[in-house]
């Protein structure tokens, strides 16, 4: 009787193992950095999260009280306008502790040409693919595969970032 039960279990395990689907090469899904951006967006420019894979993405972490962050906004808008049509996307991630309460009026007032996301508690505590954000602004450049290709602490200069974006867009 035990042998029969063991044989049935083995057959069941083998049958179920054969039902498992195997992903095709290159379809492992978005990178952990892109998955970390699955956050609520506020303001007039929503994030179409499904359009991020395959694009070069500039992720800038900021806070509404951070003066260098605010000073960097025109540079980010210019980069989006200049490179957006070629497959580039700027994404602003707000680390304000009051979240939507502060970021929604901010995003509506500035009417930026790129999405503004509201960070969640795990991200604020450094538990995301981006790790702990040590200072603001903090900017990451992701390649078309969603991997970090560049990073800047503090204000990023337009020409430096633009050159890095152009290089990734050509790949």
Regions found by a protein language model. Give the residues of each.
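A short beta-strand-turn-helix
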Residues: 36-57
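Short pre-active-site segment immediately N-terminal to redox-active cysteine/selenocysteine motifs
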Residues: 55-57, 61-65, 135
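Active-site acidic short loop of glycosyltransferases
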Residues: 53-55, 85, 112-113
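Structural microenvironment flanking redox-active thiols in thiol-disulfide oxidoreductases
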Residues: 71-110, 121-127
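Short, thiol/selenol-centered motifs that function as redox-active sites or metal-ligating centers
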Residues: 66-70
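N-terminal targeting signals for export/organelle localization
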Residues: 1-38, 150-151, 171
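Thiol/disulfide oxidoreductase modules built on the thioredoxin-like
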Residues: 110-112, 120-166
